[in-house]
């Protein structure tokens, strides 16, 4: 495991000591949680390490970690990094690599560990060579550009000049403003039309790495002949030093030495001198002075980099642009390409990894207490990320034609593959399996539905029920499903294996008691109803899943379920069924619509939201009935239930959460409890109340709220017995209600959240996230656009409209690109992709595919048919596509898939009509389909030559969907921490979130998107509690992590840059703060364009900092732009606009332009007066400032008159033009970034402070009575009560 969340020091996370009681986390109260936190805190200790040839040094370790982790630290340290083959000894005993430190006898504070060099084996020698190669390449970004080995890019250090922690000390002189160059580049100024691409990946000065060797490669004399093996030769290396010396090196069991071989003569005898060294680096230091100098300098640089810049990410991130990287000779990479990996991971003695066994064994680990759960989750997560990487490599090998099919005689589309113990199949409808469901379209969507099912069952995590490791890879237009292999499944026919479910969509169905028992446990969390279907012999068969879900017992005796594509109920808005009428809300909006396949399912988030909505309604109804009974109005009950169900259908989000009658609700809770206790004697009336409420909301039970769906309803070919007809009718109604719920509740909810800016999408990815969180599928895009267009003030949703349209265009283009690519063979890929991009984005009217390659293809076509060309099209058909034709297809795809009419015939019309920009569309399409293009400036608008040439297409990457295993305990701590923060207990919140961070690190390693959220919130809390340097350190990690895991221009990364800029400013690092803001100001228009609501906040930040460094004209450009954007999205009378006016007024005042300043402050004052009233603090402040400005203006006028009258003899009073103090700038920055709670008046604050202090004194008194420590607690108390007043400030942040 690599470095944890420390800055290069070996700070390992505290891991959990076993808890006293082994209860599940879920059963714990909050007190329980806090109890647990205290137990987990774990003290590290210091040990000394003795290494041959290096002075003894100390490192910090934790009792929880393994010996192996000390190995890892030594391989990372500057002075010991070149050693790999050693053991650690304590008092002469060799330590087991996998032993936990706490289990080692006599291992304690001050122990001395000895590093002892061990003899090499072939495997150890390979590991050593690979490690040295990694050290030589440690600053080289090519692996990140090529998307290899979980490397990814980060550019933060370019804008901070290295690590912020250290440079903070150097840059403390932030007040000497003369040294700061504040001029932003032209292209980031408001209103600039220029969108350059090159600055996206600035050249890092470390990237011209110091070259240590010219060539370092395996020798052609490998492997050693038998007699040399018996002398201990393991392998031979060939090196050319920078001094042009050619040397041949033997790796032997004792180490490395020079031999006498040349390129053409084999002479394995040691050279004279042979310099036998245990490490390759020590040998090369002797041979080459340049190597010695440069290697040392390189390692110094490597360890100075922030660990987060170099730690591998759990899943590979691909970059859509890259500069021209020189292709250097690299022996390890060359060997990797031609052999199965022999590195750390892949090489388990004698075999490739048995993925299925690993995936299932990790699930079987015990989970009684926290340490066990952490260990289990860490193992699950690690194996999943390894499996995903292997599956991705395999899928690419399959499509590139490098894997032999297991059924080679069949047609290409029908072939299946096994590679590295993973089974691969292609997303085509083979053997008409999906004929009734939409053929190839259904076969294409089925793997993702299946993956969603696997996700859901994995999350429920029932003991004894197993799913397959599943990864879905889209690559070069093909969809490949990769699955782990059930032991024994390949030896028998599917018909014999399946003991539960159906292999023919419900004609023959079987069931099995053990499967029913296991699936029953998942049915409540997944809301699946147990139901009965008829098989082909009209026998009743009981199921607890959809019929397609198959149960197979493997040869390992485990119960597997597979084909989970119908885990969630069908979406009736896209499944017209004869003879069924949909609710009026659906028909009014034009549903149901015919879709290209019949596998449209509701998302799990939608099912959960729908059930939650029904539960609120159930409580409301029951409470209402109870109140009525109390008033003895029994006769109203009948009509009430019916109006309730009517009300239910039309319930919009506005009515959804009315305050329930608390009295009634309390009674209902009581009623539920008494019913459970005395089933017989319960008052029949109370039963009736619950029964009525249950019936009205569609609960499957009559005594409690329980809503479940039957996933087989509306499945063609599935029949139900007669006695369950009523139940089936109820289920149909429930599905119709759920379909209506998407349209009447969830889509309006999304729009409302966009309006009040609680969700602010900036690109396709963030839009999809927002829709998916609310359970809205992307096929509803057209409907969402309709709703947005009909909004009363459409301009307030401009940003959403623009992203929606861009998403419809790029997704339609993606669908077309997929089939387009299937007809292209490997040698023509670059030409075909550049031709497609030209047709899609270039203004060049007659884009013709590049002729040379076109001729090549047609001449060679006959020979090349053996390449995996799964499309039925002619290999050169792609070359005939024209821009007109492509855009016509995009428009028809948008209509048929999203039911949206695009009003454009070519790219330039689309840009004009919908106010889009080509660079953003280019980014979207590249990310969606995995294209990587050359980093350079593209001229999209030239009418004389096409935008892209085939040299511009650098690579095509896979787009991978996989399961994301969760760190559940850590997540609970994180949520409790957020809750505490929102209640205003910052200190307690901070402790819980720190604990969550430890646990996240434990499970995920150092890099993960959830750790990123954790660090962001911690930084915010540090900042609010006044610890600016800690805030800076945590936020720096958050930025690095966001760049590495989500992408350098992902909207979240842009946000992280803005937070970091604020903390830099607070730490007096003004120029760094500006650099970071300028970076964000470059990225946002690239991703979205000008005029996004978030741009107002960004421009206000930039304007304020520029004001602080006295760049008044520049400052005004940004602040006035922010004012315009705020007025557009929040309305001209909003408080945000008032604040914008005030900020602009302040700058005009410092410029001495009092008339403009007065005008803006008056506008602000009017808003405050109308919104908050005359007595509000804000209104009064504004009024005071107006008076001051008026006085200044009068003074100025008087001076001017004096000058006019008396000319140069005038006796003038000097005017006060004061530059703003940094403190006042920081105050304003805090306000606009939501760090202070604006609308609270002074009186409110005092009330709040008194209340907080009263509560804390109460708490302290209780604690004091228990601990007799009242005295020591007092100072701490007053501190926290102060910080609690700012609590409101974190609420908006923590919600994300």
From Swiss-Prot:
UniProt biased composition (Polar residues): 1278-1296
Biased composition (Basic and acidic residues): 8-26, 1263-1276
Residues annotated as domain Clu: 333-575
Domain of life assignment: Eukaryota
GO biological process terms on file: intracellular distribution of mitochondria; mitochondrion organization
Function (record text): mRNA-binding protein involved in proper cytoplasmic distribution of mitochondria. Specifically binds mRNAs of nuclear-encoded mitochondrial proteins in the cytoplasm and regulates transport or translation of these transcripts close to mitochondria, playing a role in mitochondrial biogenesis.
Stated family: Belongs to the CLU family.
Name used for this protein in its record: Clustered mitochondria protein homolog
Organism: Xenopus tropicalis
């Amino acid at each position: 495991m690599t470095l944890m969340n420390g800055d290069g020091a070996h700070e390992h996370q505290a891991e959990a000591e076993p808890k006293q009681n082994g209860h599940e986390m879920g059963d714990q109260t909050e007190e329980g949680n806090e109890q647990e936190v205290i137990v987990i805190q774990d003290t590290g200790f210091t040990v000394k390490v003795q290494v041959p040839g290096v002075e003894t040094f100390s490192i910090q370790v934790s009792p929880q970690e393994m010996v192996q982790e000390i190995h890892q630290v030594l391989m990372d340290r500057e002075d010991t990094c070149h050693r790999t083959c050693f053991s650690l000894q304590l008092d002469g005993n060799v330590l087991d690599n996998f032993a936990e430190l706490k289990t080692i006898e006599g291992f304690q504070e001050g122990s001395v560990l000895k590093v002892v060099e061990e003899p090499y084996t072939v495997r150890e020698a390979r590991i050593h060579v690979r490690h040295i190669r990694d050290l030589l390449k440690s600053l080289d970004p090519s692996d990140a550009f090529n998307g290899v080995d979980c490397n990814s890019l980060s550019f933060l250090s370019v804008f901070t000049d290295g690590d912020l922690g250290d440079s903070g000390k150097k840059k403390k002189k932030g007040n000497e403003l003369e040294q700061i160059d504040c001029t932003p580049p032209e292209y980031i100024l408001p209103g600039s039309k220029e969108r350059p691409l090159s600055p996206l990946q600035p050249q890092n000065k470390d990237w011209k790495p110091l070259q240590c060797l010219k060539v370092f490669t395996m020798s052609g004399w490998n492997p050693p002949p038998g007699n040399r093996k018996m002398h201990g030769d393991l392998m031979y290396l060939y090196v050319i030093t920078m001094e042009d010396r050619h040397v041949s090196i033997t790796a032997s069991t004792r180490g490395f030495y020079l031999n006498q071989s040349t390129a053409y003569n084999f002479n394995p005898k040691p050279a004279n001198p042979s310099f036998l060294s245990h490490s390759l680096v020590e040998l090369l230091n002797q041979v080459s002075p340049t190597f010695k100098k440069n290697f040392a300098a390189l390692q110094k640089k490597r360890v100075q980099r922030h660990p987060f810049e170099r730690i591998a990410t759990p899943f590979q991130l691909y970059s859509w642009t890259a500069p021209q990287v020189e292709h250097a000779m690299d022996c390890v990479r060359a060997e990797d390409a031609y052999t199965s990996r022999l590195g750390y991971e892949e090489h388990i003695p004698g075999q490739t990894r048995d993925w299925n066994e690993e995936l299932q064994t990790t699930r079987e680990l015990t989970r009684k207490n926290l340490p066990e759960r952490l260990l289990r989750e860490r193992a699950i997560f690690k194996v999943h990320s390894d499996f995903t990487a292997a599956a991705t490599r395999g899928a690419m090998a399959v499509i590139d034609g490098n894997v032999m099919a297991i059924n080679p005689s069949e047609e290409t589309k029908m072939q299946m593959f096994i590679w590295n113990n993973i089974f691969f199949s292609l997303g085509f409808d083979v053997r008409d399996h999906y004929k009734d469901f939409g053929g190839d379209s259904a076969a294409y969507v089925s793997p993702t539905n299946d993956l969603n099912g696997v996700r859901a069952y994995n999350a429920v995590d029932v003991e004894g029920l197993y799913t397959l490791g599943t990864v879905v890879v889209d690559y070069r237009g093909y969809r490949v499903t990769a699955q782990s292999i059930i032991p024994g499944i390949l030896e028998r026919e599917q018909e014999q294996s399946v003991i539960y479910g159906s292999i023919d969509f419900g004609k023959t169905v079987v069931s099995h008691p053990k499967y029913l028992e296991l699936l029953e446990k998942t049915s409540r969390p997944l809301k699946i109803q147990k139901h009965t279907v008829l098989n082909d012999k009209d026998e009743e068969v009981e199921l607890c899943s959809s019929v397609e879900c198959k149960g197979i017992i493997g040869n390992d005796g485990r119960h597997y379920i597979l084909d989970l594509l119908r885990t969630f109920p069908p979406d009736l808005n896209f499944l017209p069924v004869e003879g069924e009428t949909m609710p009026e809300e659906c028909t009014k909006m034009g549903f149901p619509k015919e879709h290209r396949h019949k596998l449209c399912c509701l998302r799990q988030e939608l099912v959960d939201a729908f059930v939650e909505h029904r539960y609120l309604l159930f409580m409301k109804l029951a409470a209402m009935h109870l109140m009525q009974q109390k008033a003895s109005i029994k006769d109203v009950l009948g009509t009430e239930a019916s109006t309730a169900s009517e009300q239910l259908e039309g319930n919009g989000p506005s009515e959804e959460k009315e305050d329930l009658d608390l009295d009634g609700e309390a009674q209902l809770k009581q009623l539920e409890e008494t019913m459970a206790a005395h089933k017989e004697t319960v008052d029949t009336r109370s039963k009736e109340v619950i029964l009525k409420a249950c019936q009205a909301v569609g609960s499957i039970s009559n005594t409690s709220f329980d809503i479940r769906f039957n996933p087989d309803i509306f499945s063609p070919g599935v029949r139900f017995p007669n006695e369950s007809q009523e139940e089936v009718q109820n289920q149909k109604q429930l599905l119709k209600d759920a379909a209506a719920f998407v349209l009447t509740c969830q889509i309006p909810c999304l729009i409302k959240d966009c309006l009040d800016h609680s969700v602010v999408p900036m690109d396709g990815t963030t839009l999809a996230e927002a829709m998916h969180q609310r359970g809205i599928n992307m096929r509803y895009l057209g409907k969402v656009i309709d709703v947005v267009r009909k909004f009363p003030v459409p301009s307030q949703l401009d940003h959403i409209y623009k992203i929606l349209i861009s998403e419809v265009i790029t997704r339609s283009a993606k669908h077309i690109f997929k089939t387009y690519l299937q007809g292209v063979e490997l040698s023509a890929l670059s030409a075909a992709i550049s031709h497609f991009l030209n047709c899609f984005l270039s203004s060049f009217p007659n884009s013709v595919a590049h002729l040379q390659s076109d001729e090549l293809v047609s001449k060679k076509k006959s020979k090349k048919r053996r390449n995996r060309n799964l499309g039925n099209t002619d290999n050169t058909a792609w070359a005939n596509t024209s821009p007109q034709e492509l855009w016509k297809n995009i428009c028809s795809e948008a209509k048929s898939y999203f039911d949206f009419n695009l009003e454009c015939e070519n790219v330039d019309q689309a840009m004009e009509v919908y106010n889009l920009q080509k660079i953003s569309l280019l980014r979207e399409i590249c990310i969606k389909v995995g294209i990587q293009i050359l980093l350079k400036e593209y001229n999209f608008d030239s009418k004389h030559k096409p935008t892209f040439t085939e040299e511009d297409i650098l690579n095509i990457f896979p787009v991978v969907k996989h399961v994301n295993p969760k760190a559940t305990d850590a997540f609970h701590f994180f949520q409790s921490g957020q809750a505490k923060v929102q209640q205003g207990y910052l200190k307690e919140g901070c402790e819980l979130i720190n604990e969550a961070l430890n646990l996240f690190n434990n499970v995920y390693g150092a890099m993960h998107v959830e750790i990123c959220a954790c660090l962001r919130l911690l930084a915010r809390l540090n900042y609010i509690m006044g610890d600016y340097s800690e805030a800076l350190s945590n936020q720096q990690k958050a930025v690095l992590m966001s760049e590495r895991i989500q992408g350098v221009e992902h909207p979240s990364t842009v946000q992280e840059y803005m937070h970091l800029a604020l903390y830099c400013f607070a730490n007096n690092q003004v120029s760094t703060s500006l650099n970071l803001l300028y970076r964000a100001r470059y990225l946002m228009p690239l991703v979205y364009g000008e005029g996004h609501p978030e741009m107002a906040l960004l421009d206000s930040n930039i304007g304020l900092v520029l004001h602080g460094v006295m760049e008044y004209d520049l400052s005004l450009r940004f602040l006035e732009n922010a004012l315009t954007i705020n007025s557009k999205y929040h309305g001209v009378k909003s408080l945000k606009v008032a604040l914008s006016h005030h900020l602009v007024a302040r700058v005009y005042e410092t410029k001495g332009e009092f008339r403009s300043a007065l005008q803006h402050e008056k506008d602000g004052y009017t808003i405050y007066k109308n919104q908050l009233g005359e007595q509000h603090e804000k209104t009064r402040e504004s009024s005071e400032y107006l008076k001051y400005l008026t006085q200044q203006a009068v003074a100025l006028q008087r001076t001017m008159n004096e000058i006019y009258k008396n000319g140069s003899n005038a006796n003038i009073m000097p005017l006060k033009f004061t530059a703003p103090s940094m403190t006042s700038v920081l105050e304003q920055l805090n306000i606009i970034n939501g760090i202070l709670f604006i609308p609270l008046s002074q009186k409110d604050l005092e009330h709040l402070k008194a209340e907080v202090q009263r509560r804390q004194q109460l708490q302290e008194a209780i604690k004091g009575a228990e601990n007799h420590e009242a005295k020591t607690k007092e100072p701490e108390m007053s501190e926290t009560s102060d910080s609690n007043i700012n609590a409101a400030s974190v609420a908006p942040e923590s919600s994300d």
